Amino acid sequence: MGYNKGDNYEQNIFDLLTSKGLIATGSTRGGAGNATDIKFPHNFQEYNLEVKLDLEADYGQKMMKWDNGIWGWCVDDAVTSFYTSVGVLDIVNAKNFIPNRYSIARDEITTQQKNQDQKAFEDKVEIDINSLYDFYGGKDCYYIQIGGYGFYHLKRDILSLGTSQFDCKMKLRLRAKTIHSSPVYKYGFYAVLKVDKKEKPKKSCFDIEQKDGREFPPII
C-alpha cells in the first residue's frame, strides 16, 4: 500500500509538470527502480527530480542475508552501495550474533527464536545528511519534491532557483521484519533510511502542488 500511495503521488507530480509543459514528449517516470523519478527541463536542458510522498517515505528498504558468518545484501544495487558506504554492513557485522533464521532448520524455528533475532538485529543509527546529498549527487539529482513540505535542493542549488536545502536528520533503521505471521520463519532482515521525525525540515516556500500558499518553483 505504501508503494502504491508513493507511486500515485509521483504520477500526480508528473501530471502537474506535464500540464505546464515541463515534461518532454515521450518521457516516463522512473518508478520503483534505481532511476531518478522525474526529469524536468530548464533552459533547454533536463534535470533530475526525486519525489517523495511525505516525510514518512523511506529512501530505499533493502533486504539483508547472513552467509558463512557474514552479513551482506540479497541484491546489490545503487542503494545498497550507498548503505555500504555509510557503514551499514560494518554496523550489522559488529553485532556478532548468529541469526536463528539462518542457523536452524526453518520449520523448526520457534516464536521465541524469532524474537531473539529481532532483539539482536534491530537498531537505529543516525546518518549524516551529507551522505544522502552525495548519494543523489552521484545520480546527478539535486532537487526533491516532498508531499506537504514542498520543493528543495539537495547537495546544492545548481540552477540558482533560490530553493531551501532539504536539511534534517536521517535515521537508518535495522529491522527483523515479519513477512507473514505463519509459518514463523517467514521474516527477513532489512535496512531502511528515513527522516528522523524528531527534527523535521522547515517547509519550503516552493511546491509543485502549490499547497498552503507555497509558490510553484521557478523552473519554467
Language-model segments: what does each one mean?
Residues 1, 11, 19, 25, ...:
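Catalytic cores of nucleic-acid endonucleases
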Residues 6-10:
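Nuclease catalytic cores
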Residues 24-34, 41-43:
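Active-site metal-binding core of divalent-cation-utilizing nuclease and nuclease-like domains
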Residues 36-38, 142:
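Residue-level detector of beta-strand structural context in well-folded domains
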Residues 38-40, 47-53:
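Conserved catalytic cores of phosphodiester-cleaving nucleases, focusing on short active-site segments
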Residues 205-220:
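Charge-dense, extended regions
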